[in-house]
Amino acid sequence: MAKVIGIDLGTTNSCVSVYERGESKVIPNKEGKNTTPSVVAFTDKGEVLVGDVAKRQAVTNPEKTIYSIKRIMGLMSNEKNAQEAKARLPYHVVDRNGACAVEIAGKVYTPQEISAKILMKLKEDAEAYLGEKVVDAVITVPAYFNDSQRKATKEAGTIAGLNVLRIINEPTAAALAYGLDKKEAEKILVYDLGGGTFDVTVLETGDSVVEVLATGGNAFLGGDDFDNLIIDWLVNEFKNETGIDLKKDVMASQRLKEAAENAKKELSSAQETEINLPFITADATGPKHLVKKLTRAKFEGMIESLVAETITKINEVVKEAGLSKSDVKEVVMVGGSTRVPLVQEEVKKAFGKELNKSVNPDEVVAIGAAIQGAVIKGDVKDVLLLDVTPLSLGIETLGGVMTKIIEKGTTIPVKKNQTFSTAEDNQSAVTIHVLQGEREFARDNKSLGQFNLEGIPSAPRGVPQIEVEFDIDANGILTVSAKDKATGKAQNITISGSSGLSEDEINNMVKDAELHKEDDKKRKEAVEARNSADALVHQTEKSMNELGEKVPAEDRSNIEAALNDLKETLKDENASKEQIDAKVQALSAASHKLAEAMYKKDDNASGEQSGGKKKDDDVIDAEVE
């Protein structure tokens, strides 16, 4: 029987897996790696490069190297996220029939076509590994992908020569890989933070059933955004020092992206990293070099609001599932960006328990997709996967209101209908405007498409009966139909251990480490002191802004002086631990007044709260006429 491959088509990296001999395993690519960069490049000779080879030449070919294509998949050109992507990406994002596309050397490609090239490579790698032709596939998408994005993903698979058996949600695939062998029912939360998207899903697993209880997320939040914050910081620092704006230089921008991504990765294990980009640009005075040190504390200060956004979403989804955090037995971390220490710390803090990191965050989604493929083919028996629609679906009705037909969180596949009528006398046609979202008015939701039902017999308003049916298949893709009950006329639309070192090299490294142990210790202490100092600077500035006028002028002046002293010391790359510690101590002493102001603020707030009259939680204030 032909094999089914499971594909995690990621923003940054992609992965392919297969289920054979009773287990799902990752298929290495031809380069021997388990993941393939989601990068496509076009050369001057007309070659198309995919994966590592495309990524390696990105700096010298920025305008013809396409990455993060998933961020504009299924996106309309007038959407806010499309405008942001266009401003960020070095290649040309253009409009094609109202939707986002990319232009390379005068030719326009849709995101589906670019994604298909990635899928083709994964397909070819799988065929080389398995020694047979592969056609059938299960492809994953972020749980919070809307209908347009899901349909575009399926189209990419078709262009790549794949028969897409199913589109499933990434957190659901991860849960399938994690929970398939669980005998007792348990509720788990999958926190999935990838390169370009964020999902959080609460599921119940056990006894071969994986049921989604609630899901939420942000299809435009991920590791790319962490990188962009580092890039912005580097650009601003360089501009302040030289007056040159690196964002206007596409080759420099590509080098910055690469450096930012590497810095982010290094800060997952190190307290400090150096970003060194020689000959980044040049002016009349000669070549310019960019050399900056970035501490983990500084980086965490940059990304804390984005991480906080994910924690807010966790709380919403747990509540939507009708659970408390204590009901969640395991928190499973998925996606490469969950390696960032601050992400782990904040999620752990939110639940007050250790995180489950037993799964490989880069591979588990593809592994789950392959399991789902085996379920569809019948190779895995008695497994039931119950997924849900992430957003409500409905149509526009009189007054521009969105009338929901399928509510968010409904288990799929599902089919629901509702009967509507005409708004005017003798109306012979109605326009069915299909929407997705949670807002009350049509204009605030995502428009999925519209179609007309014509030939309605003349009748007073409110008399004709038009049945609108929404049908979501197991892929989460929607078909809408409308039928005039009197005539039977109908219309529909598919919205569619090897370190690589020898023993001698290892022994030499051990001896070298012993010789430089004291120097290394001092350097490490200085880095840790710098890291703590960065954190103190950030926290002090944040507290000053929050307290504002509550800090007396004299105290504010003393704190600002100590703050500036510490900042000046930190500018000195060779500052010792003792020098930094002295300035930290001075700032800490000056900052005691901030703590007093903070406690005073908290006391006042609690006093006001206790002084007010307590209202019952279940009582809703209302006026009755």
Swiss-Prot record:
The keyword Nucleotide-binding applies. InterPro entries: ATPase_NBD, Chaperone_DnaK, Heat_shock_70_CS, HSP70_C_sf, HSP70_peptide-bd_sf, Hsp_70_fam. Disulfide bonds: none annotated. The keyword ATP-binding applies. Induction: By stress conditions e.g. heat shock. Pfam families: HSP70. Residues 598-625 are annotated as: Disordered. Keywords: ATP-binding, Chaperone, Nucleotide-binding, Phosphoprotein, Stress response. The modification Phosphothreonine is found at T197. One of its GO terms (molecular function) is ATP binding. Acts as a chaperone. Belongs to the heat shock protein 70 family. PANTHER family: HEAT SHOCK PROTEIN 70KDA. This is Chaperone protein DnaK. It comes from Campylobacter curvus (strain 525.92).
